[in-house]
């Protein structure tokens, strides 16, 4: 079992299989020119899998594959099957923008993927183009339906932005509700790679909007879950991920592995240690020691919390998967 110095059990590994993305979302990607890490500097699936085995053997029970956009990395379903074959009952999930999902949903399900979280910030084509900086909505919605048809459980992630999609939150909730998918509204996480002019809605503002049409009751928060859960009168539940709340980090159970091999204890901070040398030489003991060291470095909380002057993270989310 992996336990940090604050007594939090860490059983959740998020793996960024690539930092590349086929979108340029304004709340994620930098405004200035940048270059991707060369492909030859990324861990191979075999190297990633070696660390996955270490993490599972140490007590990890949940793995999520992220990016960038994970589906732009070739043969992702092969990596999914490697993990699933090693630990068939592992909670194996994927976070995606959905654009390529129509091509891969069934293959991923057959390989052992169980769940998907999909970004959907708007149902309006022009707004989608504004956010992603390309025309994407038709492909995203087609991918969503393909995932449901493949038998995957799908949650929708929506970043709530003032003046962009705040007039659509109820429509988005109803879109998810009618398809029996949970939607989670995400507070915009300030970071130095995003557009400076973006302003996010806080959880209270999101609730005020939903409450204009629905009676909303706060539900019991699941252990280790990042989202606060709310219930409508008909029993439908939606979530709000609110990293600005002071208790957001109290039950954090996750660590992150970047595509180039950096093991990251916290999304907000830049601290990380590399496992690349260890896994490239097949050093299981060395990789395990680095995992323990990163766990010891896991901070108590981020600095988005109320009372921390709303500091801005310098972390590039497209490199760590958010």
Swiss-Prot record:
<keyword id="KW-0547">Nucleotide-binding</keyword>
<dbReference type="GO" id="GO:0006777">
    <property type="term" value="P:Mo-molybdopterin cofactor biosynthetic process"/>
</dbReference>
<feature type="binding site">
    <location>
        <position position="68"/>
    </location>
    <ligand>
        <name>S-adenosyl-L-methionine</name>
    </ligand>
</feature>
<keyword id="KW-0411">Iron-sulfur</keyword>
<feature type="domain" description="Radical SAM core">
    <location>
        <begin position="5"/>
        <end position="233"/>
    </location>
</feature>
<dbReference type="GO" id="GO:0061798">
    <property type="term" value="F:GTP 3',8'-cyclase activity"/>
</dbReference>
<keyword id="KW-0479">Metal-binding</keyword>
<dbReference type="InterPro" id="IPR007197">
    <property type="entry name" value="rSAM"/>
</dbReference>
<feature type="binding site">
    <location>
        <begin position="254"/>
        <end position="256"/>
    </location>
    <ligand>
        <name>GTP</name>
    </ligand>
</feature>
<keyword id="KW-0408">Iron</keyword>
<dbReference type="GO" id="GO:0046872">
    <property type="term" value="F:metal ion binding"/>
</dbReference>
<dbReference type="Pfam" id="PF13353">
    <property type="entry name" value="Fer4_12"/>
</dbReference>
<comment type="function">
    <text>Catalyzes the cyclization of GTP to (8S)-3',8-cyclo-7,8-dihydroguanosine 5'-triphosphate.</text>
</comment>
<dbReference type="Pfam" id="PF06463">
    <property type="entry name" value="Mob_synth_C"/>
</dbReference>
<feature type="binding site">
    <location>
        <position position="27"/>
    </location>
    <ligand>
        <name>S-adenosyl-L-methionine</name>
    </ligand>
</feature>
<protein>
    <recommendedName>
        <fullName>GTP 3',8-cyclase</fullName>
        <ecNumber>4.1.99.22</ecNumber>
    </recommendedName>
</protein>
<keyword id="KW-0949">S-adenosyl-L-methionine</keyword>
<feature type="binding site">
    <location>
        <position position="155"/>
    </location>
    <ligand>
        <name>GTP</name>
    </ligand>
</feature>
<feature type="binding site">
    <location>
        <position position="189"/>
    </location>
    <ligand>
        <name>S-adenosyl-L-methionine</name>
    </ligand>
</feature>
<keyword id="KW-0004">4Fe-4S</keyword>
<comment type="subunit">
    <text>Monomer and homodimer.</text>
</comment>
<feature type="binding site">
    <location>
        <position position="266"/>
    </location>
    <ligand>
        <name>[4Fe-4S] cluster 2</name>
    </ligand>
</feature>
<dbReference type="InterPro" id="IPR050105">
    <property type="entry name" value="MoCo_biosynth_MoaA/MoaC"/>
</dbReference>
<comment type="pathway">
    <text>Cofactor biosynthesis; molybdopterin biosynthesis.</text>
</comment>
<feature type="binding site">
    <location>
        <position position="64"/>
    </location>
    <ligand>
        <name>GTP</name>
    </ligand>
</feature>
<feature type="binding site">
    <location>
        <position position="21"/>
    </location>
    <ligand>
        <name>[4Fe-4S] cluster 1</name>
    </ligand>
</feature>
<dbReference type="GO" id="GO:0061799">
    <property type="term" value="F:cyclic pyranopterin monophosphate synthase activity"/>
</dbReference>
<feature type="binding site">
    <location>
        <position position="252"/>
    </location>
    <ligand>
        <name>[4Fe-4S] cluster 2</name>
    </ligand>
</feature>
<dbReference type="InterPro" id="IPR013785">
    <property type="entry name" value="Aldolase_TIM"/>
</dbReference>
<comment type="similarity">
    <text>Belongs to the radical SAM superfamily. MoaA family.</text>
</comment>
<feature type="binding site">
    <location>
        <position position="28"/>
    </location>
    <ligand>
        <name>[4Fe-4S] cluster 1</name>
    </ligand>
</feature>
<keyword id="KW-0501">Molybdenum cofactor biosynthesis</keyword>
<feature type="binding site">
    <location>
        <position position="95"/>
    </location>
    <ligand>
        <name>GTP</name>
    </ligand>
</feature>
<feature type="binding site">
    <location>
        <position position="25"/>
    </location>
    <ligand>
        <name>[4Fe-4S] cluster 1</name>
    </ligand>
</feature>
<dbReference type="InterPro" id="IPR000385">
    <property type="entry name" value="MoaA_NifB_PqqE_Fe-S-bd_CS"/>
</dbReference>
<feature type="binding site">
    <location>
        <position position="119"/>
    </location>
    <ligand>
        <name>S-adenosyl-L-methionine</name>
    </ligand>
</feature>
<keyword id="KW-0456">Lyase</keyword>
<keyword id="KW-0342">GTP-binding</keyword>
<dbReference type="Pfam" id="PF04055">
    <property type="entry name" value="Radical_SAM"/>
</dbReference>
<feature type="binding site">
    <location>
        <position position="249"/>
    </location>
    <ligand>
        <name>[4Fe-4S] cluster 2</name>
    </ligand>
</feature>
<dbReference type="InterPro" id="IPR010505">
    <property type="entry name" value="MoaA_twitch"/>
</dbReference>
<dbReference type="InterPro" id="IPR013483">
    <property type="entry name" value="MoaA"/>
</dbReference>
